[in-house]
């Protein structure tokens, strides 16, 4: 996998290559980009491992050196094709307000209904917790 990435394969091309090879993924179906990324970002590649939220290094011999691992991570990061989505949200507190009961982020909801007494469409915007009954 590492050699293919260094040769310029995209994650999709690598997944297709692995599907055509004899390498069988853990669940036995097709290779997914997410599972390939988990493997390529795992510190086990250079001999480290995660324990209680910390990365312990030098526990065993890795497949590549730590320097090569860091170069691989930079390469993967530089190849990412993510762009910030521009939003024209009317919810100014979106993802900023927390539920006072459970601490999860409040979601935004918008409803439009027709009010008969003055024959108008009324827009109602509000925030609610997904975990509230």
From Swiss-Prot:
An MF annotation (GO) of this entry: DNA binding
PROSITE patterns: RECOMBINASE_DNA_BIND (PS51737)
Pfam families registered for this protein in UniProt: Recombinase
InterPro entries linked to this entry: DNA_bind_recomb_sf, DNA_bind_recombinase_dom, SSR_resolvase
Regions recorded as binding DNA: 1-82
This protein's name: Uncharacterized immunity region protein 5
Organism field: Bacillus phage phi105 (Bacteriophage phi-105)
Lineage: Viruses, Duplodnaviria, Heunggongvirae, Uroviricota, Caudoviricetes
């Amino acid at each position: 996998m590492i050699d293919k990435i260094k040769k310029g394969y995209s994650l999709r091309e690598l997944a297709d290559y692995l599907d055509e090879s004899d390498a069988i993924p853990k669940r036995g179906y097709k290779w997914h980009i997410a599972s390939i990324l988990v493997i390529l970002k795992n510190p086990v590649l250079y001999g480290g491992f995660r324990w209680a939220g910390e990365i312990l290094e030098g526990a065993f011999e890795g497949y590549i050196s730590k320097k090569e691992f860091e170069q691989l991570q930079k390469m993967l990061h530089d190849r990412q094709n993510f762009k910030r989505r521009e939003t024209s949200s009317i919810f100014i507190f979106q993802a900023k307000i927390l539920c006072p009961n459970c601490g999860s982020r409040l979601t935004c909801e918008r409803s439009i209904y027709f009010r008969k007494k003055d024959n108008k469409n009324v827009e109602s915007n509000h925030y609610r917790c997904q975990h509230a009954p």
